Amino acid sequence: MNKRKPDWLKIKLQGAEKSHEVKDMLKRLSLHTVCEEANCPNLIECFGRKTATFMILGSVCTRNCTFCNVTKGLTQAVDAEEPSNVAQAVKELGLKHVVITSVTRDDLPDGGAGHFAKVIEKLRPTEVIVEVLIPDFQGDREALDTVIRAKPHILNHNIETVPRLYATVRPKASYARSLELLKNSKELDPGIFTKSGIMVGLGEQEEEVIAVLQDLRAVDCDLLTIGQYLAPSAKHHPVIEYIHPELFKKYKDVAYEMGFKYVASDPLVRSSYHAADVSHIIG
């Protein structure tokens, strides 16, 4: 698709000066953010507000999703200092809500679940709301339980797209497995808030998106994000369509009618964009 981006996807650059402070701190503490690795369009705004989504377990992924800009290839050794460094970064930024995500580490026996737990445990003594955005751990319920037992406030796992597109968009993932993870999360801890997200503009149909929302509610998913897919480069899955803001509003209205507790649906929404907006729900 060669069509130019519509006006509603144009971003005002603000907060650039403060964003350098965040980048300097991340470098000092040897930390990665999904904001940088995924080439997020909201990076300057979020860094300018001194918020970030920390990406643990290195910067190299074992999966080959065609929508993602994170580096694929040979993985790195797990940094034992990372949990302490994340906690220090959260303290320096004065965060009230922190999002921790990771590359997918299919090469690790537990998929990195134990490392997630260590990061959460370092943050739990603070007042910060801890949200984790986790991979599917290849369906390993024990790995999921390891994360759940560490007591994050929000368990996020993105469904990403409609089932029909998984073969081309997420070839190593499974729609059913992702739904099962969200279902199991509630079974392991009924009090945890679960969250998921979907990208649109990949070639899905409106009725397919509605069906995904129904599937998410069927496993008692609480929080939802819907955003426009933007291809990081010409080598990635192409943008098939730029979805009009009115359709995002429709998805939002439909989702609330289904019973989601919080819905962010807008072209520039990303999974952790303005994540702290749910703080009034978490309590």
Swiss-Prot record:
Domain of life of the source: Bacteria
A GO molecular function held by the record: 4 iron, 4 sulfur cluster binding
Substrates-to-products reaction catalysed: [[Fe-S] cluster scaffold protein carrying a second [4Fe-4S](2+) cluster] + N(6)-octanoyl-L-lysyl-[protein] + 2 oxidized [2Fe-2S]-[ferredoxin] + 2 S-adenosyl-L-methionine + 4 H(+) = [[Fe-S] cluster scaffold protein] + N(6)-[(R)-dihydrolipoyl]-L-lysyl-[protein] + 4 Fe(3+) + 2 hydrogen sulfide + 2 5'-deoxyadenosine + 2 L-methionine + 2 reduced [2Fe-2S]-[ferredoxin]
Protein residues bound to [4Fe-4S] cluster 1: 35, 40, 46, 272
Gene3D superfamilies: Aldolase class I (3.20.20.70)
Domain Radical SAM core positions: 47-261
Xref: PROSITE patterns: RADICAL_SAM
A GO cellular component entry from the record: cytoplasm
Cofactor: binding comment: Binds 2 [4Fe-4S] clusters per subunit. One cluster is coordinated with 3 cysteines and an exchangeable S-adenosyl-L-methionine.
EC numbers on record: 2.8.1.8
Cell compartment(s), UniProt: Cytoplasm
Chain residues that bind [4Fe-4S] cluster 2: 61, 65, 68
Keywords: 4Fe-4S, Cytoplasm, Iron, Iron-sulfur, Metal-binding, S-adenosyl-L-methionine, Transferase
Family annotation (CDD domains): Radical_SAM (cd01335)
Family of this protein: Belongs to the radical SAM superfamily. Lipoyl synthase family.
PANTHER family: LIPOYL SYNTHASE, LIPOYL SYNTHASE, MITOCHONDRIAL
Protein name: Lipoyl synthase
Source species: Desulforamulus reducens (strain ATCC BAA-1160 / DSM 100696 / MI-1)
Lineage: Bacteria, Bacillati, Bacillota, Clostridia, Eubacteriales
